[in-house]
Amino acid sequence: MARYTGPVTRKSRRLGVDLVGGSSAYEKRPYPPGQHGRARIKESEYRQQLQEKQKARFTYGVMEKQFRRYYAEAVRSSGKTGEQLLQILESRLDNVVYRAGLARTRRMARQLVSHGHFTVNNVKVDVPSYRVSQYDIIDIKPKSLNTLPFEVARETAGERPIPGWLQVVGERQRILVHQLPERAQIDVPLAEQLIVEFYSK
């Protein structure tokens, strides 16, 4: 399945979650699109589970096949499957760049990673789905530091809270991964148990 490249605000309204991050268009009309968008629809259990899975997929920009792999890995892990799945999604490099405030959206973070602006433990990484580990050190490449995206990130530092499992240090905007996130540190409005139920059928 190809990555979704359509109108993100419309998809946000369809799924009932802001996929952009601070989208004024979504805030004005947080109900489903269409002539009867405001109408209440009694949702089946399956529909609720499917919608929650889609919310997770589109929030993190993950295709179905990859999402299934993440779920299978979460099942094999110790701990609650839903929480393990969210931890896997949060530990993607593109998400870490977004969480650290170096990109306004996850889409932008994915693009910055793909363009080769980052190193992890002094090794260039240009794969957005790369998974960080505890104690990893993520740096912006020196030649990229003074490019517009990172100048803007420095100017807007502090506008969005950085989760406690990450730290951004100094003018070089080095990201330190102190730990992988616990469920309480993940503020995405997802009911992960519904995703577990969807795949358990």
From Swiss-Prot:
What's a Gene Ontology MF term here? structural constituent of ribosome
Residues forming the S4 RNA-binding domain are: 91-157
Q: Does the keyword Cytoplasm apply?
A: no
GO cellular component term, pick one? small ribosomal subunit
In terms of domain of life, where is this protein from? Answer: Bacteria
Region (Disordered), start-end ranges = 19-41
* Family matches, as InterPro entries: Ribosomal_uS4 (IPR022801), Ribosomal_uS4_bac-type (IPR005709), Ribosomal_uS4_CS (IPR018079), Ribosomal_uS4_N (IPR001912), S4_RNA-bd (IPR002942), S4_RNA-bd_sf (IPR036986)
HAMAP family with a match to the protein in the record: Ribosomal_uS4_B
User: What task does this protein carry out?
Assistant: One of the primary rRNA binding proteins, it binds directly to 16S rRNA where it nucleates assembly of the body of the 30S subunit.
Q: Which PANTHER family match?
A: 30S 40S RIBOSOMAL PROTEIN (PTHR11831), SMALL RIBOSOMAL SUBUNIT PROTEIN US4M (PTHR11831:SF4)
Against NCBIfam families, the record matches this protein to:
PRK05327.1 (NF003717), rpsD_bact (TIGR01017)
Family affiliation: Belongs to the universal ribosomal protein uS4 family.
Q: How does it assemble?
A: Part of the 30S ribosomal subunit. Contacts protein S5. The interaction surface between S4 and S5 is involved in control of translational fidelity.
The protein's name is Small ribosomal subunit protein uS4
Instruction: Give the source species.
Output: Mycobacteroides abscessus (strain ATCC 19977 / DSM 44196 / CCUG 20993 / CIP 104536 / JCM 13569 / NCTC 13031 / TMC 1543 / L948) (Mycobacterium abscessus)
| Lineage, top ranks | Bacteria, Bacillati, Actinomycetota, Actinomycetes, Mycobacteriales
